[in-house]
């Protein structure tokens, strides 16, 4: 496929070595080594090409960088329903935090009412990165003007042994403390979160410099 060839044309071996250290569980052989700015540029270029539709249907991908590009392509979708469908087709194949976190569909901002039920489904998933993605979307889109205190219950009710799920819960509540202190502080004061998540939330909140 032409897209994969172009990824190899952008290869940076040293960056691949660096990225491998940041993504446990991802083999060095599966990492081409494409820097994110170059991948973003390629995604914007291919959104206008018919090959991008073929690429997102061609699952699973062989390379980590193909998955990163896939996530970046989904972030550029203009149609909400098509975006959600494509996201849900891709999520089962997401197997690391970097690919999960690179997905940030811009179209979601304009469809908050339709998005929330999907977020609830994703958070309830047993798949690590589907759950993580759901919480990240809740954090990105519902801690500001569209905030409701009840939304904090969604991540608070997730109890997991998975590191990348628990890190996301901590990240969510550290952000909630910065943006919605009055609603979020009770979860800390009342010990509502699992011990590890509780401690990590406090650590991340302090490190963010948004809370003193």
What are these regions (language model features)?
Residues 1-212:
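Alpha-helical scaffold domains
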């Amino acid at each position: 496929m032409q897209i994969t060839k172009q990824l190899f044309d952008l290869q940076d071996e040293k960056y691949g070595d660096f990225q491998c250290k940041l993504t446990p569980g991802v083999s060095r052989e599966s990492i081409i080594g494409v820097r994110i700015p170059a991948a973003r540029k390629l995604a914007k270029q291919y959104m206008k090409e018919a090959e991008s539709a073929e690429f997102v249907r061609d699952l699973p991908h062989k390379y980590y960088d193909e998955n990163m590009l896939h996530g970046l392509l989904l972030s550029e979708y203009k149609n909400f329903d098509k975006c959600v469908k494509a996201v849900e087709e891709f999520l089962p194949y997401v197997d690391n935090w970097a690919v999960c976190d690179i997905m940030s569909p811009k179209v979601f901002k304009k469809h908050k009412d339709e998005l929330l039920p999907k977020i609830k489904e994703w958070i309830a998933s047993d798949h690590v990165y589907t759950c993580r993605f759901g919480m990240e979307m809740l954090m990105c889109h519902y801690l500001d003007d569209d905030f409701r205190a009840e939304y904090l219950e969604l991540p608070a009710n997730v109890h997991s042994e998975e590191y990348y799920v628990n890190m996301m819960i901590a990240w969510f509540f550290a952000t909630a403390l910065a943006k919605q202190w009055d609603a979020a502080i009770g979860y800390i004061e009342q010990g509502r979160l699992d011990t590890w998540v509780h401690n990590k939330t406090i650590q991340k909140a302090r490190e963010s410099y948004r809370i003193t």
